């Protein structure tokens, strides 16, 4: 089973992580594989909450840069995260993992409202909690939502699953000389403008001394490895 190093974690997935190789929408095989892996993490005894982006369906920032009202675009992005959250709930429950979706925007027919104490009770009972609709406010990314929810539920760490195996000095797919950083401080991330999380999310983690681990979600077994304390990817923390 493995023994969890982190008792309570918040896993942040990009919307693209659900799209698989097609690059958009939701790929059933990909989401089923992620659900099966999360089931293994739950079996270790670790408590896991999820925040999923919406970029596989709609990108608010991209739409606003082309003339759409930023607040409207961001609300559309929040709805995209709810589509992903419901899809992930379905995939998790199909593999036998009790899952609750909590939305920052009221939509009582499809999800619980976000209530911090209720979310913590769900986690204590061994359920997965998926936080949808970001923070419920425009101008805030799902990275910031992940940082905020992680603080609120008392998570030990944020795990950011991406398509690369850590943080690099440049895009490793475009620049063969890019260097991978095994460890970084929050200030290094902010000063170098590294694509870990946006500055608001990183600053929030820094102020509350919450570690961030960036790792490759596309390799099966990596979520469990990180939760059990194996050093893969890049860890971002204080001095």
From Swiss-Prot:
Sequence positions that bind ATP: 12-15, 55, 59, 162, 168, 171
GO molecular-function term, one example from the UniProt record: UMP kinase activity
EC annotation from Swiss-Prot or TrEMBL: 2.7.4.22
UniProt signal peptide: none
Pathway: Pyrimidine metabolism; CTP biosynthesis via de novo pathway; UDP from UMP (UMPK route): step 1/1
Binding sites annotated in the UniProt record for UMP: 54, 74, 135-142
Catalytic activity: UMP + ATP = UDP + ADP
InterPro entries: AceGlu_kinase-like_sf, Asp/Glu/Uridylate_kinase, Uridylate_kinase, Uridylate_kinase_bac
Renumbered residue ranges of the record's region Involved in allosteric activation by GTP: 20-25
Location of the protein in the cell: Cytoplasm
Entry's Gene Ontology BP terms: 'de novo' CTP biosynthetic process; UDP biosynthetic process
Keyword Cytoplasm: yes
EC top class named in words: transferase
Entry function: Catalyzes the reversible phosphorylation of UMP to UDP.
Quaternary structure and partners: Homohexamer.
Name of the protein in question: Uridylate kinase
Source organism of the structure: Geobacter sulfurreducens (strain ATCC 51573 / DSM 12127 / PCA)
